[in-house]
């Protein structure tokens, strides 16, 4: 049935003058953007909402004139940052809030004119920005190295959970009774969620779902719906099981690509009584074979393992994939004629002219990574204009490899039980080490300093 029923080649709603975009709505003049809504002139990005004039951003919202951001919100001219909100005209920030004119900072709140977490006058800060020259790639590498070194000296909150009650996971906003979940907003009484937004209630094992969804189980991508299980890309369905790409339907079982239908099994129409009888027989047979209650088997995936986002979060080699009987797509023999290698690119963006637009640039990884490296890439005109306008160095990696560098800034989608590392006597626990326990996405062997909520608040605010 999956092979016979036509599928939409792309999921695009109200797209205007876009190239290489999918899974979104209201995109205007965007390029290589996957996932999101209400975006204009967003390039090389994924899962972006209500943003414009930005490049290389992921899982971000209300961002403008920014570059290389991950999990950032309400930002203007924010560059090379992650998990930072309400920040303006700043560079290299980690876990900062409401900051302006800050450079290379970690864990700051309500600050201005800070450089690597140290305060400066306005004049000193502006002089530093000029002397540092953000358009230099060598300076960029040095700044990143300094930021990572600083990051290991600063305490980190055990989890990025905001305005939430009785919830655990990471990157949660306004969650209530939500557990072992990640990158989600406005969720309630749910567990094992990933990137679920705007009204998800009583849902388990669900990803990329949102907008008033309830009583869902084992769902991969969709909007709305109630009492559904084992589905892919379904919108506003009710009382349904094992369906794919069905919209506005009720009482479906094992259907593909239906619209506004009711009482269908394997795309065949039944009466209400027939539907219940046949459905129950199928469920009984599936249960006897141990199949009912499980998601679609991976052999039904239309894509190879390394073509999906599974490779982003659970990377495998070809040998590992094949040993698990997963399909694998071999790299294409691209035979690019490389015009320029990264070591031959001028260091400063202002030294680069428009001739670069005609060049095939070798990716610095040269295909030797697990990041779907394209081995070479080109700079598009709008991209070069942006780099020059913002004085940012030319990238040395292809868009795919840049994407993988960004998502590495996310902690694993997994929790460990740990104890607060704080030993400061002036905190609420007094002398000795804090004994507060919590669930955190920071693995025990990681080098970061992890604090409980109270110790973190006392240290940062």
Model regions and ranges:
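Long, distal/terminal scaffolding or interaction modules
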Residues: 1-461
């Amino acid at each position: 049935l999956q092979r016979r029923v036509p599928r939409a080649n792309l999921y695009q709603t109200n797209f205007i003058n876009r190239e290489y975009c999918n899974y979104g709505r209201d995109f205007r003049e965007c390029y290589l953007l996957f996932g999101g809504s209400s975006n204009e002139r967003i390039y090389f990005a994924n899962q972006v909402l209500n943003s414009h004039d930005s490049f290389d951003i992921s899982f971000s919202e209300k961002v403008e004139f920014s570059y290389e951001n991950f999990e950032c919100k309400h930002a203007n001219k924010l560059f090379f940052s992650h998990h930072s909100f309400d920040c303006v005209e700043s560079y290299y920030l980690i876990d900062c809030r409401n900051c302006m004119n800050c450079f290379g900072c970690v864990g700051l709140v309500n600050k201005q004119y800070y450089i690597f977490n140290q305060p400066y006058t306005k004049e000193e800060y502006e002089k530093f920005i000029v002397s540092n020259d953000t358009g230099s790639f060598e300076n960029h590498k040095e700044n990143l190295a300094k930021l990572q070194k600083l990051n290991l000296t600063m305490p980190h909150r055990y989890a990025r959970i905001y305005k939430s009650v009785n919830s655990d996971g990471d990157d949660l906003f306004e969650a209530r009774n939500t557990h072992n979940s990640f990158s989600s907003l406005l969720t309630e009484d749910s567990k094992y969620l990933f990137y679920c937004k705007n009204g998800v209630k009583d849902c388990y094992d669900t990803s990329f779902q949102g907008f008033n969804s309830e009583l869902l189980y084992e769902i991969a991508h969709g909007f709305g719906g109630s009492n559904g299980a084992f589905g892919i890309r379904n919108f506003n369905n009710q009382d349904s099981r094992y369906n794919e790409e069905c919209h506005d339907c009720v009482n479906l079982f094992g259907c593909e690509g239906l619209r506004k239908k009711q009482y269908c099994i394997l795309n065949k129409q039944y009466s209400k009584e027939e539907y219940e009888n046949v459905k129950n027989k199928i469920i009984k047979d599936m249960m006897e074979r141990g199949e009912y209650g499980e998601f679609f088997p991976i052999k039904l995936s239309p894509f190879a393992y390394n073509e999906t986002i599974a490779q982003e979060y659970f990377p495998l080699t070809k040998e590992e994939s094949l040993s698990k009987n997963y399909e694998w797509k071999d790299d294409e023999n691209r035979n690019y004629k490389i015009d320029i290698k990264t070591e031959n690119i001028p260091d400063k963006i202002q030294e680069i002219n428009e001739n670069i637009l005609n060049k095939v640039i070798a990716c610095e990884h040269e295909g030797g990574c697990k990041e779907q490296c394209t081995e070479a890439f080109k700079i598009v005109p709008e991209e070069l204009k942006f780099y020059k306008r913002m004085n940012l160095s030319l990238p040395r990696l292809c868009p795919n490899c840049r994407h993988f560098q960004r998502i590495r800034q996310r902690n694993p989608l997994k929790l460990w039980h740990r104890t607060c590392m704080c030993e400061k006597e002036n905190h609420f626990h007094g002398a000795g080490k804090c004994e507060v326990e919590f669930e955190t996405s920071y693995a025990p062997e990681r080098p970061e300093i992890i604090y409980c909520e109270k110790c973190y608040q006392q240290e940062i605010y």
